[in-house]
Amino acid sequence: MYYNMQVHSAYDLLNSTIKYESLFSKLIKDNQKSVVIVDPNMYGAIKAHKEAKKSGVNLIQGLEVSLGYGIGLLKFNILCKSEKMFYKLLEISTKFMNEEEWTVENFANEVIDYKDDFVLIIVDELRDSMEFSYLNNLI
């Protein structure tokens, strides 16, 4: 069984035009039982939850994160394993929108108390990088 681990929705304006209604209809049609939505914000999270519940598809909420590291960015997805983490992601997403730049240290300080409630998904080219090792050690 195939599960898409990185769906972006229309709430990620520059990366997707997928609306939740059509997404969940397509998932049902294709007999997919789960989906992971990882937009760079949580604007559509409640609507996605309602559509998932209505359709019977298991939704894993996530957030695409870009952190300043040196002169570059460290990008990864953080996925919720609990309702507690879902609310923390809502809070983090709001803080991202209100502050200029987040660092690896800022992010680690925000999530350190929740380390059993989330999963980090790192893109392959970063898996062995110094940046990922640094983030992993902080958390």
Region annotations inferred by a language model:
Residues 1-139:
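Phosphodiester-processing cores and adjacent nucleic acid-binding clamps
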